[in-house]
Amino acid sequence: RILYADAEGRIKIAEAFNNAVASGELSAPVILGRDHHDVSGTDSPYRETSNIYDGSQFTADMAIQNVIGDSFRGATWVSIHNGGGVGWGEVINGGFGLTLDGSKDAERKLKNMLFWDVNNGISRRSWARNDEAIFAIKREMGKNSALKVTLPNKVADSLIEKHF
């Protein structure tokens, strides 16, 4: 299931599983999976996206965008479903399965897909002006020069109230 780790941590864990399969320490492939309840796979205004305060926590963009991105980056399967433990109607979940068979191809896929899977959700939250997400995506861009995320420009509430 899920791990509360950043992209780097998840990639290292997945690499360890893939290497264990390659070396024979594990006798069969490993499937990494996520159904919901994570940084990027769920739009749920009562749980996963409850820390998005710009009104967009009720949209399904993150789950949909995420499974499309995961599929392009090597997921073995992706899924879109509703519910996720908080009921039907206002929640959409995007999940994936990723087969780690010990191959170099699996290593390439795990790096591409897990990097996207985590940072897509962090980016989405940063665009909604979540302070922790802005911090996290800036940190990730500092580690990886290929990652370019447009950062939000915050406006003082008093300025908005004055003009609107």
Labelled PLM ranges:
Residues 1-164:
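Conserved internal helical-beta-strand scaffold that buttresses enzyme catalytic cores
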